[in-house]
Amino acid sequence: MSEWLFDLGNSRFKYAPLHGNRAGQVQAWAHGAEAMDAAALAALPSGRIAYVASVAAPALTQPMIACLQERFTQVRIVRTTAECAGVRIAYADPSRFGVDRFLALLGARGDAPVLVAGVGTALTIDVLGADGLHHGGRIAASPTTMREALHARAVQLPASGGDYVELAIDTDDALTSGCDGAAVALIERSLQHAQRSLGVPVRLLVHGGGAPPLLPLLPDASFRAALVLDGLATWATAAASP
């Protein structure tokens, strides 16, 4: 396979072959080149074109780009643009709109009207109308980041553990219930607003490594694990068009 898709997130590095206008089988690693041993680096694919999207810090992005440049004839870095593949970004300055959010919207274009919720280091929420117009969104801490922040300020509060219950009777469950519940409430409120604003039913798509624990609390949501990579595939297909 000569064309590959690479997504460097804040916490994970994922890649997949480009199959038509979709991502193929996804592989994921802990963060970036510094988190991958020599055997893992040697197993990275090679080919003609690597399409790369990164929201990671330059210290993590640059070594991975250098690694890919040794394996591919071309390495193409994706940037957010005002319009692509029928999606129009609402930001006055599209360069300030995260490329992961941009690609998630490209991946969700066929599901519009849709609310896209990404759960990783951050919780991102974006609304896309049936006409491809982005109606804005929100950014908050994800449940994992909430837990880590609480633990950093109050070490007696564990950074993980516990189950979701509506009214917890121990600290671990209370933390999970509070942080997961806060994320779910923000998603639900945003979905309600989107449906009132657009005047039509709006689908809910959820993606990201932190999404699975929230899915039982969002029964109407569809989980799309490879949404950003699918969006990257859409971008690559559009870029290849004359």
From Swiss-Prot:
The keyword Zinc does not apply. It is found in: Cytoplasm. The active site is at D100. GO terms for cellular component: cytoplasm. Pathway: Cofactor biosynthesis; coenzyme A biosynthesis; CoA from (R)-pantothenate: step 1/5. Its cofactor is NH4(+); K(+). A monovalent cation. Ammonium or potassium. Keywords: ATP-binding, Coenzyme A biosynthesis, Cytoplasm, Kinase, Nucleotide-binding, Potassium, Transferase. Pfam families: Pan_kinase (PF03309). It is an enzyme of class 2 (transferase). ATP binds at D7, L8, G9, N10, S11, R12, F13, K14, T121. Its EC number is 2.7.1.33. GO terms for molecular function: ATP binding; pantothenate kinase activity. It catalyses: (R)-pantothenate + ATP = (R)-4'-phosphopantothenate + ADP + H(+). GO terms for biological process: coenzyme A biosynthetic process. Substrate binds at Y91, G98, V99, D100, R101, T171. Its main location: cytoplasm. The keyword Amino-acid biosynthesis does not apply. InterPro entries: ATPase_NBD (IPR043129), Type_III_PanK (IPR004619). Belongs to the type III pantothenate kinase family. Catalyzes the phosphorylation of pantothenate (Pan), the first step in CoA biosynthesis. Homodimer. This is Type III pantothenate kinase. It comes from Xanthomonas euvesicatoria pv. vesicatoria (strain 85-10). The lineage of its organism: Bacteria, Pseudomonadati, Pseudomonadota, Gammaproteobacteria, Lysobacterales.
